[in-house]
């Protein structure tokens, strides 16, 4: 009976000592958190291993992440994975689709993003661009003659139109002089002509008898306007004037219309402010609808694919510029010892318990061996 009690005692003590020793060793990894002193003498094994080596741990964790976890090869392999690319493209298409089907107005979106001033800036910028383009255009064309400034097609159209213009002028003139207003105007012109020529009027009156001068002149004027020779004469005159105009400088236009007036007139016609305001009052969906399908089906996949290709080619440079090791090191360095302990224990809690139990098991086995040795020695 005493023999079995001795074996049980040695086994129990061995298990307790083994389990407690391992448990204490695990605790000494983290505790105490700070060095302990007896007088000026620092107690050995204080602080615990991890608090004492926390800075080194932070550095090593940073190196481990960069050298073994987030490696350029691993990230590059992920970026070139076909399933990953499909998933990313699908996600991008869904998100872009949500934005492009938004029924809120562009103005509301700008206000929401606190960039409502964009409307004023856009209006000013567009007007400034228009002004600069007009001034540059005028600056260039003011150095040309009309012949140089106008395209060849315009020259042809004008020259082909001159006979038609002559016919139109003569037709309108004929209609005018056939009317009562035209006859009255012609009569006044004749009266004014003979007003200072009294003797000539009496002489003409002797030849015409009771018929008024205007009744004789009006048919002749209309007849003259209807003759082919008159049309050719007017056509030749217009052609000569056109030839003269082609040789004149465009800059002469500035004497009739100032540059500022041209710019102002164009800006008034364009109505930049009203156009921008009308554009911003449209919903995002209205603005994007004409190009929505093209953007989602073609542009988004293309952009994502090119972005992933660029990322794959430059992943090493990106990681170097991110300084991930330093980021991990800085983050770990900011952890309190308690948080670091909780973090490690949350990952290795079960394994550390098993180490404690293993220590108890080994201690118990050693106790059994001791008990057997005592039995044989007796």
Swiss-Prot record:
InterPro entries: DUF445 (IPR007383), UCP032178 (IPR016991). This is UPF0754 membrane protein BCA_0919. One of its GO terms (cellular component) is plasma membrane. Its main location: membrane. The keyword Transmembrane applies. It is found in: Cell membrane. It is a multi-pass membrane protein. It comes from Bacillus cereus (strain 03BB102). Belongs to the UPF0754 family. It holds the Pfam family DUF445. Keywords: Cell membrane, Membrane, Transmembrane, Transmembrane helix. Coiled coil: none annotated. The chain crosses the membrane at residues 1-21, 357-377. It comes from the Bacteria.
């Amino acid at each position: 009976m005493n023999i079995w009690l001795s074996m049980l005692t040695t086994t129990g003590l061995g298990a307790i000592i083994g389990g407690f020793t391992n448990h204490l060793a695990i605790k000494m990894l983290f505790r105490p958190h700070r060095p302990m002193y007896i007088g000026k003498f620092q107690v050995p094994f204080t602080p615990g291993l991890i608090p004492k080596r926390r800075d080194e741990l932070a550095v090593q964790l940073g190196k481990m992440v960069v050298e073994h976890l987030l490696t350029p090869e691993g990230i590059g392999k992920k970026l070139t994975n076909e399933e990953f690319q499909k998933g990313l493209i699908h996600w991008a298409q869904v998100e872009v689709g949500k934005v492009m089907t938004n029924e809120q107005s562009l103005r509301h979106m700008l206000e929401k993003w606190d960039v409502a001033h964009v409307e004023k800036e856009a209006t000013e910028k567009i007007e400034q661009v228009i002004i600069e383009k007009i001034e540059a255009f005028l600056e260039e064309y003011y150095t040309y003659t009309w012949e140089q400034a106008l395209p060849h097609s315009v020259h042809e159209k004008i020259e082909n139109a001159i006979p038609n213009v002559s016919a139109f002028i003569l037709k309108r003139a004929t209609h005018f002089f056939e009317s009562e207003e035209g006859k009255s105007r012609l009569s006044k012109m004749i009266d004014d002509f003979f007003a200072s020529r009294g003797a000539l009027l009496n002489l003409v009156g002797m030849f015409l008898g009771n018929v008024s001068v205007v009744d004789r002149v009006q048919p002749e004027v209309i007849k003259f306007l209807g003759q082919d020779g008159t049309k050719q004469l007017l056509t030749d005159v217009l052609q000569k004037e056109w030839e003269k105009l082609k040789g004149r400088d465009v800059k002469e236009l500035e004497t009739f219309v100032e540059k500022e007036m041209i710019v102002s007139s164009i800006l008034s016609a364009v109505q930049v402010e009203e156009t921008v305001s009308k554009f911003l009052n449209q919903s995002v969906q209205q603005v994007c609808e004409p190009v929505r399908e093209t953007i989602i089906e073609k542009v988004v996949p293309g952009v994502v694919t090119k972005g992933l290709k660029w990322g794959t080619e430059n992943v090493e440079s990106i990681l170097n510029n991110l300084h991930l090791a330093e980021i991990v090191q800085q983050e770990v360095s900011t952890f309190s010892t308690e948080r670091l302990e909780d973090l490690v224990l949350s990952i290795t809690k079960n394994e550390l318990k098993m180490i404690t139990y293993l220590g108890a098991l080994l201690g118990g086995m050693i106790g059994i061996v001791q008990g057997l040795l005592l039995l044989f020695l007796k």
